[in-house]
């Protein structure tokens, strides 16, 4: 059902791809995030160069739909709080973003950058959450996993079959890319790491 796929990958996927990075970059609501130049470029790149390329519908129609979604994000009368949208983000990432990431890999034989960065941003948001100044709301099994000590959190998240239904470390190049972005986020902060991604 391509139209359902369009909604999940573009409308829902866009939220999940951006909100955790957005919150950790200091934004509180979707509209402020989407009006930031770097985030807008990040979202456009993820949409046009990655997500849309995996959906079997007319590209112009998909871009029109994507633009209508971004306009909705920009609605001055609705304050979509990023933390509200962050609820259960692990399951949401699987349903909304991982499908695009894997479809892209299967179609083009390479790992998509923005979707991998958003994966790294997800891990950064959850990692060591008990010592952070924001609430992380997810199911107990997810919270328990992130409370546990990990020598390599990126590897362990990707290898968690319970989260993803498969061991993602077996996808050639995915671990290396997500780990590189995660390390950039840790050393540079989200905004600078994102600028580096956009310069690739």
Give residue spans per PLM region:
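Non-transmembrane, aqueous-exposed alpha-helical and coiled segments at domain scale
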Residues: 1-200
């Amino acid at each position: 059902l391509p139209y359902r796929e369009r909604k999940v990958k573009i409308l829902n996927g866009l939220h999940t791809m951006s909100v955790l990075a957005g919150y950790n970059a200091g934004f509180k609501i979707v509209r402020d995030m989407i009006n930031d130049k770097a985030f807008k470029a990040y979202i456009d790149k993820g949409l046009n160069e990655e997500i849309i390329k995996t959906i079997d519908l007319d590209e112009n129609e998909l871009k029109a739909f994507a633009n209508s979604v971004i306009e909705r994000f920009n609605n001055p009368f609705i304050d979509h709080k990023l933390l509200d949208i962050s609820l259960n983000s692990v399951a949401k990432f699987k349903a909304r973003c991982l499908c695009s990431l894997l479809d892209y890999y299967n179609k083009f034989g390479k790992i998509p950058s923005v979707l991998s960065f958003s994966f790294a941003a997800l891990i950064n948001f959850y990692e060591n959450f008990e010592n952070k100044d924001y609430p992380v709301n997810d199911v107990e099994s997810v919270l328990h996993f992130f409370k546990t000590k990990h020598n390599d959190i990126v590897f362990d998240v990707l290898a968690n079959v319970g989260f993803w239904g498969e061991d993602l470390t077996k996808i050639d190049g995915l671990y290396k890319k997500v780990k590189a972005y995660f390390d950039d986020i840790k050393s540079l902060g989200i905004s600078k790491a994102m600028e580096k991604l956009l310069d690739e």
